[in-house]
Design a protein with these regions (language model features):
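Conserved loop->alpha-helix
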Residues: 1-94
Length: 94
């Protein structure tokens, strides 16, 4: 679940097509990923993406063809700025 409050602005730094799907890398800049683990969700321009790799200064996510067909993600390019929000946890203050 997300609040809709943007925590940081990141940047798309890599796009790797895989069949009809896509793997993308987001550089997070000022977003603290210290509490993020593989499998966590991060809203990226409002699209809920699951973290599959954590290289240190960002994250990788796999995007299905269904997500590509039903969001604006297909139009994202390397260099596209994206709004970021980590998913809420049971301990998150609202």
């Amino acid at each position: 679940m997300f609040t809709g409050i943007i925590e940081a602005v990141g940047e798309i730094v890599a796009l790797q097509p895989s069949g009809g799907d896509l793997r993308l890398r987001v550089k997070t800049n000022e977003l603290d990923l210290g509490d993020v683990v593989l499998g966590d969700s991060i809203a990226t321009n409002g699209v809920c993406l699951t973290v599959v790799e954590l290289p240190g200064d960002g994250y990788w996510a796999d995007v299905s063809v269904e997500t590509l067909d039903n969001t604006t993600l297909r139009g994202w390019k390397v260099g596209t700025p994206v709004n970021l929000e980590k998913a809420l946890t049971p301990q998150t203050r609202l």
